[in-house]
């Protein structure tokens, strides 16, 4: 499962694909439940339950978000929830261990350089930091700080809102392991069905982080329901196409505007 800075895939899609401008500033909170499962090239599956939470403050031109999650991971004890191979590297391990605890803290700030209402495309730039609050001894994280930069282009054409982004992440190196700095990219589109419903699809790619792993590749689809002006519900499914991604996953995200 990829607990990326867009933070959980469903949250990322939900927040990216909607062109909502808050002139006076607005605070929102999210709570989710996510499950994913994959073998990551091993003989045994890694199963991850996550309960992500986040707070986001947004104005017309910038936003800042802090997010974390509570994790329950059952795995051969060498794959983190990010799909990084940092344990024994023994892909034939037969014993699975269950660990749980708080995940890493992710903080991201985004600035709108180009307003999509005024220009051919909209352009957002983001800076991100992962603070290692997850227990590395339980393989819930790497125990190191990561930094990232991201640029995203988007525009609305009637009911369609396509987007494309590219990012680079500087990885901290756990002792004894060489995690590579990586490029990543995502492409997708949102479709507005009516005033209450929108749906969309997306594809995510990321360079491999270690010599033992592959490039991560995932496709996803989601449906978003606007309960009222203050509450939204998002349901998503995803499938992976490499040993660095889960075989499949699904989740539910609740968003409340304060």
Model-identified regions with their sequence ranges:
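Cleavable N-terminal export/targeting peptides
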Residues: 1-26
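Transmembrane beta-barrel domains of Gram-negative outer membranes and organellar outer membranes
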Residues: 22-173, 182-249, 253-258
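Active-site cleft segment of glycoside hydrolase catalytic domains centered on the general acid/base Glu
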Residues: 177
């Amino acid at each position: 499962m990829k607990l990326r800075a867009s933070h959980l895939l469903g949250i990322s899609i939900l927040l990216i694909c909607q062109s909502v401008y808050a002139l006076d500033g607005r605070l929102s909170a999210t709570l989710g439940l996510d499950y994913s499962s994959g073998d990551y090239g091993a003989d045994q599956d890694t199963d991850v339950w996550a309960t992500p939470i986040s707070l986001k403050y947004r104005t017309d031109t910038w936003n800042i978000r802090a997010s974390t999650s509570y994790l329950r991971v059952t795995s051969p004890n060498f794959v983190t929830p990010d799909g990084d191979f940092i344990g024994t590297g023994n892909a034939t391990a037969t014993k699975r261990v269950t660990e749980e605890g708080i995940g890493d803290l992710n903080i991201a700030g985004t600035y709108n350089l180009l307003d999509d209402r005024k220009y051919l495309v909209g352009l957002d730039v983001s800076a991100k930091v992962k603070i290692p609050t997850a227990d590395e001894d339980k393989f819930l994280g790497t125990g190191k700080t990561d930094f990232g930069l991201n640029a995203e282009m988007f525009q609305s054409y009637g009911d369609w809102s396509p987007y494309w982004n590219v990012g680079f992440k500087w990885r901290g190196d756990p002792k004894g392991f060489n995690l590579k700095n990586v490029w990543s990219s995502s492409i997708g589109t949102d479709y507005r069905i009516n005033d209450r419903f929108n749906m969309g699809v997306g594809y995510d790619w990321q360079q491999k982080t270690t010599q033992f792993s592959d490039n991560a590749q995932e496709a996803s689809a989601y449906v978003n329901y606007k309960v009222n002006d203050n509450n939204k519900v998002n349901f998503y499914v995803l499938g992976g196409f490499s040993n660095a991604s889960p075989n499949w996953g699904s989740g539910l995200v609740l968003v409340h505007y304060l």
